[in-house]
Amino acid sequence: MTAVLLATLAALGALGVPEDHPVPAVRVVAAAPMWEPLAKQIAREAPGVVTRVAVRLDLPPPPEMLVVVTGDPPRTAAEEQRLGLDGVPPWAAGIAEASTGRIVLFAREAASYPHRDTNGLLAHEATHVLLEASVPRGARIPRWYHEGLALSVERSTSLEDALELAWSLAWSRPLPLLALEEGWPAGEVDARAAYAQALSMVAMAERHAPPGGARRLVVRLRAGDPFDRAFTIAYGLDPEILASLWYREARWRYLIRPAFWAALSFNGLLGTLALVAVLVGRERRRRRMAEWAERERLETVDYPDGPPPLSPPVNPA
């Protein structure tokens, strides 16, 4: 293992982004005239976005990238053919073609979970392109790692991710790694849970390793290692062990601990309501005693010698 680590460190110098690297050439086009203003805005910001992705991953960007801006994912085969796409899910916000360096952004979905805006979506898809362009053709990179890494580059974890994970853990077990190797859930609800799971797992792996995990992974894949071995060397955890550790931590963080505090809060609320009820009851009794005392005082004022005796009843004639 030590020899492998030394070889990895030696190979890192041949990879990465030099400080004086050229700004990547990113060409942005609109699929329809109505999207030209947005395409021009993205074109101004795209080189900086792709450069930040390259620096974050410490991987060289491709010499040229093409970004196509349109509105919605294609709904028909004719629309897919017009965009040169195939099998796009209706909830998709973007598509990356690593072999050609082409990215298609569906602008109306750019703010839908797990994304926030077009710049973040572009960073997400650019991560897919950079990662695939850096490894040998045919190298296996599981979908869960692809999506988790792309999301971690796009943004940090959020409350919405926690809610997605809590909902998923409350109603079912997380998807096994095998289910997220090549494919992705077709339904939007399951896809949202898969995105949250992938981001959380990659974030956990990055917390357990020094910076530069993606670059170390690429070096080992270039050396011919299978993904599981390359991932273990890059992050210090076998993927299956990571999944097991993540599941235990996620259940505690997003399910058990919130339920515990919710129970405490609920019991605290019940205790507060009980205390309020006791105080209200005491106040009512105090008022009744005060009213009775006031009545007795008034009777004493009206009849200093005590109340008159009752008159005998009058017998009816």
Please name every model-derived segment.
Residues M1-G16:
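Hydrophobic secretory-pathway targeting helix
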Residues L9-G13, G87, A126, V153, ...:
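Generic low-complexity, intrinsically disordered sequence content enriched
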Residues L9-L12, P90, E97, D302:
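Compositionally biased, low-complexity repeat tracts
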Residues G16-G138, P142:
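Juxtacatalytic substrate-recognition/specificity segment
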Residues V55-P62, P211-A214, F266-L269:
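Surface-exposed helix-capping loop/turn segments at secondary-structure junctions
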Residues P89-P90, G94-I103, R116-L121, A133-F266:
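Acidic/His/Gly-enriched intrinsically disordered linker/tail segments
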Residues R253-A317:
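C-terminal single-pass membrane-anchor helix
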